[in-house]
Amino acid sequence: MSSNTVAQFATELKMPANVLLEQLRAAGVDLKSVDDAVTDSDKAKLLESLRRAHGATEGKKITLTRRQTSEIRQADATGRSRTIQVEVRKKRVFVKRDPAELAAEQAAARAEEAAAEAVPAEAAPAPAEPVRAEPAVETAAKPVEPPVAEAPAEPVAAPAAEPQSEQPAQAEAQPEPTPAAQAEPEPQPEPQPEAAPAQAVAEPVEPAKNVSVTETEAEQARPEPVVHAQTELTSKTPAPVAQPSAPAESPKSAKAEPAAAPKTTAKPGEIRRAAAPAAPDRAREEARRAAEAEAAALREMLSRPRKVLRAPEPEPQAGALSGTLHKPAGKPATTAAPKKDAKPGAPGAKKTIKTAEVSSTWSDDSARKKPADNKPAVTTRDGWRAGGKGGRGGRNSRNQHQDRRHEQVQQEFIAREIHVPETISVADLAHKMSVKAAEVIKQLMKLGQMVTINQVLDQETAMIVVQEFGHMAIAAKLDDPEAFLDETAAVTEAEAEPRAPVVTVMGHVDHGKTSLLDYIRRAKVASGEAGGITQHIGAYHVETGRGVVTFLDTPGHEAFTAMRARGAKATDIVILVVAADDGVMPQTREAIHHAKAGGVPLVVAVNKIDKPEANPERVKQELVAEEVVPEEYGGDVPFVPVSAKTGAGIDDLLENVLLQAEILELKAPIEAPAKGLVIEARLDKGRGPVATILVQSGTLKRGDVVLAGASFGRVRAMLDENGKQIQTAGPSIPVEIQGLTEVPAAGDELMVLSDERKAREIALFRQGKFRDVKLARQQAAKLESMFDNLGEGTQTLALIVKTDVQGSQEALVSSLTKLSTDEVRVQVVHAAVGGISESDVNLAIASNAVVIGFNVRAEQSAKKLAETNGIDLRYYNIIYDAVDEVKAAMSGMLAPEKREEVIGLVEVREVYTISRIGTVAGCMVLDGVVRRDSQVRLLRNNVVQWTGHLDSLRRFKDDVKEVKSGFDCGLTLRGNNDLQLGDQLEVFEIKEIARTL
């Protein structure tokens, strides 16, 4: 007897081993663990136990519903095509008949067929019995559906799946020998022909499906679904289960059967004559069994969606017609053989093939084999049997099957955790949620947002969409390469050493900041500034007798707020320069706020004390009001009177600065990768992007790979503030580097990385992130401001700004944008660093913009293009001039103000009524002048009665343009004849006055 362990048996049944062990123990099988052996008799006991347990609760009726959704396009009343969803629902009910009634009918059928048998049936099922008992156990062990099979024997069960063909069943009934009747308690003569195909299933190879299996799989696992389906299709007689005690034939006897079969083959004519009397009754029986077969197969499919192997087509039919029943026993039978051997006129050949396919191809995998001549019927888990060629399924059955399968996938909803980055496209969001992009777009449309599949969503919107779909949204930064920077910073910790202080000179414009630095550096810097004002951050380091000091000179003009903030961020000490003759000014207060916000100590330099009108005491009082208290008043801020012209007090100032530096104990690691801050950046035509860097820690070397914001590169050249090449730069040293891929933003942090590939990855990540965030914000702004300007006469002044350095661009754009009013809005279409190129002029043509160049000039080709298209190019080197001219241009775009001016007064002294003309007034001009095109007000008793225009003005008989004071005239009013003696006419004009910002 064949045996295997509980664990192996559970693997075959695809169920947990411990559950199977409990079921075996409940059936009375004494097993200790999952490693114990299971015999065929144990399996039979398990099958009997499960049938007893599930038989009482077996359902009598199965109701199947099918829903199919399709779309049609139909034109509406306006002629536009609309898509309409059409849903078709169908229901089918299968009723299980009473087993007693079926048993009676089967007994009568067996009696009729026994008389028709001339030759004993072939005893093929015996060796397959033990093998088939195991699959029966497997099907019964599945608690998904109680087993319907109550038939006694598997060989008998197999033919029941082919009730439609009557003739072939009789044709195969003849060659069966009688041992089948001895082996089974209740043999059924009609279904016997299927025994040979069922045995062929147990062969090692199943070529009908092009599936290669081992002998064990073929004997135990593969026949299982077929047998289960067949047992369900048999009549429900309460006969005993297939006997495990039946002798198991050796492989030799199993292979010898096909050779012996041809000797007992009967002629086709005899078979038909013997079957003729029972034909009417059998037709009814076959029709009933066909319905039962379909219901049982549907139950099998619904309970166990496993891949099913088809039983091969019965060989004896082909043999009866061609003289050969089987191929040699060594070769497994194939389903294609009967088709080749059968003649076109052979009775029942085609029908047998069809019924065999119907009974043995219940599978959910519709794409597992190539289509044959007769397409097998396929049943899906959520639909009915889709007929093959010529069946109910039709050509669209495969598409319908795919639609049904897709519907089922949608029904199985699984809530997931969706990580939503800062920006994500609609397509990516749909992919993360495993839904179609169209569903996401539909949901966004419900939320009031019209999007496309590639549109970028911001994080908040994407999280709302995820929650609408029932998933859990988590705001996250996945795969952020910047995490690498934190790891690098943690690893590269070095010993800190003393460093030079970084001192920022701040103050109001024209208070002498640069002149003070000029004296300290002994170099003429201020004379080279345009307009005598600083428009860049200058970085210098000075060697004094007490050490090195690095100075940053910031602009004082109000436009350079961001630059001053950057200067305070990068600095250790702030020198606040205040003119002794001018006192505290707005930018002085702003510098104090920047210093306090950064927690930076202040040193006040009261400049211009050499002037006669200097008043240092007034400056002290004003600074005390700003909470900057001098040391002599009990505060902590040193006050040093200096003169940038004579040099008085400069040494005291430096001494105070170095004293503050000693108190701060400034330290930084030197032997470490450099980190710094981008002070300024520009695009040089010959050298490319150039950045001024203040090294804050570590040592920057020539050839280092650096990352600055969204740009990266290798340091190709390094210059100090005097333009000399240097190889290294330590902490607190300002340098100018070349070799970056693009111009970084001023204020970006710079750091040295060991891996250029990683630097490129982080830079590209930052670029994409910046672009996505910018686009998402623009989209949100568009949606919010869509109706803001609707109906308003808002005018827009478009500008393209090109500057020499990043800081100037930032300051200029900020200043120009602040000029916007409710009526005229300044729109900076494009702002960048570098000269004015042809592409800038093309952009100006497209957007009708004015091009502003700040310390830059246009290329020759750009100049010609601008002249040809009438584009206005403006060059400036002082920020005041640029702001003032843009303000003047905006004033010209403002709607003029209309004012009313009274120019004369007329009194009515005579009134004449003339036909075809109307009422004519004879008047005297009392004051001013009356003009023909003027407007008038009719005054009666000093109350305004009417306002309008003069229709005509005459003096005597002549039309005149105007009549001055002291002269009489005749006039008519346009659209008004109500004139009386004593009325007065007030003559006025409306003048337009240009407005200014």
UniProtKB/Swiss-Prot annotation:
Record's subcellular location: Cytoplasm
List of residues binding GTP: 507-514, 553-557, 607-610
Stretches assigned to the tr-type G domain: 498-665
The entry's keywords: Cytoplasm, GTP-binding, Initiation factor, Nucleotide-binding, Protein biosynthesis
Biased composition (Gly residues): 385-394
Cellular compartments per GO CC: cytosol
G4: annotated segments: 607-610
Annotated stretches, region: G3: 553-556
Region described as G5: spans on this chain: 643-645
InterPro entries: DNA-bd_dom_put_sf, EF-G-like_DII, EFTu-like_2, IF2_assoc_dom_bac, IF2_II, IF2_N, P-loop_NTPase, Small_GTP-bd
Biased composition (Low complexity): 116-185, 195-208, 244-280
Major location category of this protein: cytoplasm
G1: annotated span: 507-514
CDD domains, sorted: IF2_eIF5B, IF2_mtIF2_II, mtIF2_IVc
PROSITE patterns according to UniProt: G_TR_2, IF2
Signal peptide: none
Annotated HAMAP family: IF_2_B
Record NCBIfam families: IF-2 (TIGR00487), small_GTP (TIGR00231)
UniProt function note: One of the essential components for the initiation of protein synthesis. Protects formylmethionyl-tRNA from spontaneous hydrolysis and promotes its binding to the 30S ribosomal subunits. Also involved in the hydrolysis of GTP during the formation of the 70S ribosomal complex.
Entry similarity comment: Belongs to the TRAFAC class translation factor GTPase superfamily. Classic translation factor GTPase family. IF-2 subfamily.
Name listed for the protein in its UniProt record: Translation initiation factor IF-2
Taxonomic source organism: Bordetella bronchiseptica (strain ATCC BAA-588 / NCTC 13252 / RB50) (Alcaligenes bronchisepticus)
Gene: infB
